[in-house]
Amino acid sequence: MELFAYALVFIVLLFAIIQAISSEDAPKHTTQRRRRKQQRLANKRQPENTVTHQKPQPLAVTKKPFDSTHINVKKGAVGEQIIKVEVLSKLDRSQYHYFHNLIIPHNGATTQIDNIIVSPFGVFVIEAKYYEGWIFGGQQQKTWTRTKSRYEKYPFTNPLHQNYAHVKALEQLIRQPENRFHSIVVFTHRDCQLRTELPANVCLTKQFIPYVQQFTKPIIAPDQIQRICKILSQPEWEATPERLAQHIQSLNQRP
């Protein structure tokens, strides 16, 4: 009986000790559980794969200066090639001798001529304009206008006046009177329209060859044609890149 009492007391003491230890660890486990719960909530608000995007910085843009001279040279080359194809494919080469892109002296400077045809029927001096849109102008007007829309209007020098200077330069170079020259202005862009009444020597590409072929009376002798072609064939008039650069520079320096 006494042994049973000791055993009972021992069990009670052991139970008390275990309870005391559990009560000490409880706050620690509670704190840990609270922290784990807070971490789970935080993870729900901010997923692990969330990427914070930075606001992109604007790129620096370098604007190139507008070079209208360069653009005009390129357009002139296109128009010149269109005229070249028309002449070489539709005119008799034994009668019509074609020269293109010459830079010749004029009044102490130089002038560039797009296209020249030497024939028994005269010397045709052709100014090609590769312009898109509607063309407005008059024979005596100093400035013509090219219009692409209500808000796009571009003035340009009367090409008849421009080509007159070419004719005068050729007169001096090949020593021929003015009445042996035919000045022609051809607008070569397929989307170009002449919107005002202009003389017949201002035309579109499709009208160019018929205009040339209407001149059928010989006015230049064969020996003179040979002499003129020899002069125009000289390498010194060829528009090489170096001579073209010098010509453009002289144009920019003129008042």
Where are these regions (language model features)?
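Short acidic loop-to-beta-strand element that houses the catalytic metal-binding Asp/Glu
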Residues: 112-118
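Surface-exposed interaction regions that form or flank ligand-binding interfaces
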Residues: 1-111, 143, 151-255
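Active-site beta-strand-loop-beta-strand hairpin of nuclease catalytic cores
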Residues: 118-140
